[in-house]
């Protein structure tokens, strides 16, 4: 006897049943609608890439620990993409010089990471990536932040259900310049700061000292990460007061406030973003729900990634929300539509073997009228047909029995109201 195989999906992946697929498509359609309203164009890259493009810039976790790698028959290390930013940068590097600028692109694609599955994190997940290439100015930063806010507001969330946290890698670089850190310690400190919320104060201080920070610099890092506002930050670390990075953050927050987004904005110096390729503005959308108090998605500016591909350097900024965190947000705030996915469908049962051909003809006619028609393929009595339609939640049933055919008519019954309407078969 052959081995019986499990019918369960791989841990950290999921089968998309019709009801779940409807929810996913609802989220994706909103994403697509908002991106198109900003004049962005849709694209897609292969799910397989050379592993080195992620090892180089995706950070220690995603680029090494969580990368799903295999060797192909030619001996090349290939990876299933764990994120889109290096992939789209590779793609754009091929077309950048011949393309009108800026390039405003978005994609909705699936990704795989070899990480421990948990709430809001799966091994396989879907993600929107939205990026602007070819503009390195304040206005492109402003537009991508506005788009991320409008993406949230498209789902009509309650007031104060989320916040946009803003910081800048330039500001962090300005801080590091004050610390006189050697270059090789900056990456280690950046990654440590990214884990600040997950570590105890004692462990965090200990790790900073292991990197080589003095007592004075440990205090400066602590003051930086715990600043409650821009004014609070420059009061604590006065050397940052007139830096361009501070002025950029002030300006972008003022402009977003002037556009009507003031209630959603928060300067957050403890926001670091763990990807090594960020080099300017960074941001995160944060869910404020008490049961789901976490980052939903984030993004930022990454101007140096094209150099990996020997291409002319080009500026870029983008962000990437995932399907699962978005779904949890909608569920937590009770704003996910509760819809019967079959309520708009018509059910045309086979009520007589003699009418099989006529059923196909009628189904074709109804579909030509843009109706969604599920055609019965087995002979049923009307009672069983009604029972099936009711159990599945089909909105309407089309009745064509021998009696109706003799009269050259068919009936459509609304399953909710019970109302019937008669139509000419010809």
Predicted regions and their residues:
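TRNA-binding/sensing appendages of the translation machinery
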Residues: 1-86, 94, 142-146, 163-165
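N-terminal targeting/leader regions
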Residues: 2-17, 184-235
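A general alpha-helix detector
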Residues: 12, 87, 147, 171-175, ...
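Positively charged, Gly/Ser-enriched RNA/tRNA-binding surfaces
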Residues: 23-40, 49-50, 85-96, 105-158, ...
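Beta-rich nucleic-acid/ligand-interaction surfaces
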Residues: 45-64, 163-178, 272-279, 380-388, ...
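Acidic, His- and aromatic-enriched active-site or binding-groove loops in soluble protein domains
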Residues: 63-74, 181-203, 287-289
């Amino acid at each position: 006897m052959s081995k019986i195989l499990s019918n369960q999906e791989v841990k950290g992946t999921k089968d998309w049943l019709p009801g779940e697929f409807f929810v996913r498509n609802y989220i994706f359609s909103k994403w697509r609608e908002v991106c198109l309203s900003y004049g962005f164009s849709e694209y897609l890259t292969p799910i397989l890439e050379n592993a080195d493009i992620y090892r180089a810039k995706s950070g220690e976790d995603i680029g090494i620990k969580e990368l799903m790698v295999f060797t192909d028959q030619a001996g090349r290390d290939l990876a299933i993409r764990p994120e889109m930013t290096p992939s789209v940068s590779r793609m754009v590097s091929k077309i950048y010089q011949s393309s009108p600028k800026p390039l405003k692109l978005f994609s909705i694609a699936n990704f795989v990471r070899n990480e421990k599955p948990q709430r809001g994190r799966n091994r396989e997940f879907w993600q929107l990536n939205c990026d602007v290439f070819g503009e390195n100015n304040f206005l492109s930063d402003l537009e991508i932040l506005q788009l991320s806010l409008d993406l949230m507001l498209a789902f009509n969330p309650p007031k104060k259900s989320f916040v946009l946290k803003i910081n800048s890698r330039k500001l962090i670089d300005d801080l590091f310049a004050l610390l006189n850190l050697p270059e090789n310690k900056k990456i280690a400190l950046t990654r440590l700061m990214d884990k600040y919320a997950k570590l105890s104060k004692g462990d965090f201080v200990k790790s900073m000292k292991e990197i080589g920070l003095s007592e004075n610099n440990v205090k400066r890092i602590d003051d930086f990460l715990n600043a409650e506002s821009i004014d609070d930050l420059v009061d604590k670390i006065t050397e940052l007061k007139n830096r361009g990075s501070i002025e950029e953050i002030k300006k972008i927050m003022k402009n977003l406030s002037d556009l009507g987004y003031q209630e959603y904005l928060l300067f957050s110096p403890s926001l670091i973003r763990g990807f090594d390729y960020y080099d300017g503005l960074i941001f995160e959308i944060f869910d404020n729900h008490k049961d789901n108090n976490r980052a939903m998605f984030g993004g930022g500016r990454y101007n140096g990634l094209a150099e990996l591909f020997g291409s002319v350097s080009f500026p870029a900024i983008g962000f990437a929300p995932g399907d699962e965190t978005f779904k949890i947000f909608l569920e937590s705030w009770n704003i996910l539509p509760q819809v019967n996915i079959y309520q708009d469908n018509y059910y045309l049962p086979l009520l007589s073997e003699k009418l099989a051909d006529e059923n196909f003809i009628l189904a074709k006619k109804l579909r030509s009228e843009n109706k969604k028609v599920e055609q019965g393929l087995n002979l049923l009595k009307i009672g069983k047909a009604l029972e099936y339609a009711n159990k599945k939640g089909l909105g309407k049933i089309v009745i064509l029995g021998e009696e109706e055919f003799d009269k050259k008519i068919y009936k459509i019954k609304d399953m909710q109201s019970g109302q019937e309407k008669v139509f000419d078969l010809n």
